[in-house]
Amino acid sequence: MSIKSDKWIRRMAEEHKMIEPFVPDQVRASEDGRRIVSYGTSSYGYDIRCADEFKIFTNINSTIVDPKNFDEGSFVDFKGDVCIIPPNSFALARTVEYFRIPRTVLTVCLGKSTYARCGIIVNVTPFEPEWEGYVTLEFSNTTPLPAKIYANEGVAQVLFFESDEVCDVSYADRGGKYQGQRGVTLPKT
């Protein structure tokens, strides 16, 4: 299994719509020249952006967090350019980009150091072979202070690994529960 380069990422995005919308280069400034958290194609990965729709976790109901029976009422929906995550809490969001992962590919997604150095951890599980959809992102604020997440800017980097052989059963073959997800998606069992 080998990591794929910027050339491969560009080719797969342009010829097979692996990433939509696709940015072929690294963007480091907004159209008005303001510095932003970078996004787009890098040497051996693709820096994804966070869309402007968020679910911010609050514990107003003193709920027990149960991944098998998650209380949707524990979230406040928010739409905007900047999301404030409460201290020691988390928020969910989705990517701007829609992904279509080839059958021979598995991805690993890592948070950007800009956020990590501020105590904001980005968690995303691997994109499995033949999975497609918008990626649900989880942001943990590990600090005792409120923390900002910026919509439409880079939040994490996706690394693409291609196997030497095709898997017997892909995510699509087994009817994965998050296949084709469109918005911020809560836990499913």
From Swiss-Prot:
Coiled coil: none annotated. The active site is at 138 (proton donor/acceptor). Its EC number is 3.5.4.13. Keywords: Hydrolase, Nucleotide metabolism, Nucleotide-binding. It comes from the Bacteria. Transmembrane segments: none annotated. GO terms for molecular function: dCTP deaminase activity; nucleotide binding. DCTP binds at residues 112-117, 136-138, 157, 171, 181. The keyword 4Fe-4S does not apply. One of its GO terms (biological process) is nucleobase-containing small molecule interconversion. It is an enzyme of class 3 (hydrolase). It catalyses: dCTP + H2O + H(+) = dUTP + NH4(+). Pathway: Pyrimidine metabolism; dUMP biosynthesis; dUMP from dCTP (dUTP route): step 1/2. InterPro entries: dCTP_deaminase, dUTPase-like_sf, dUTPase_trimeric. Pfam families: DCD. Homotrimer. Catalyzes the deamination of dCTP to dUTP. Belongs to the dCTP deaminase family. NCBIfam families: dCTP_deam (TIGR02274). PANTHER family: DCTP DEAMINASE (PTHR42680:SF3). This is dCTP deaminase. It comes from Burkholderia multivorans (strain ATCC 17616 / 249).
